[in-house]
């Protein structure tokens, strides 16, 4: 994952 784990979680929620 290039972004942080927090960002990844946010993308999944989107």
UniProtKB/Swiss-Prot annotation:
Name of the featured protein: Large ribosomal subunit protein uL24
Single GO cellular component term: ribonucleoprotein complex
Keywords of the record: Ribonucleoprotein, Ribosomal protein
Keyword Ribosomal protein: yes
Organism: Spinacia oleracea (Spinach)
Family in the record: Belongs to the universal ribosomal protein uL24 family.
């Amino acid at each position: 994952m290039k972004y942080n784990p927090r960002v990844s979680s946010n993308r999944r929620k989107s």
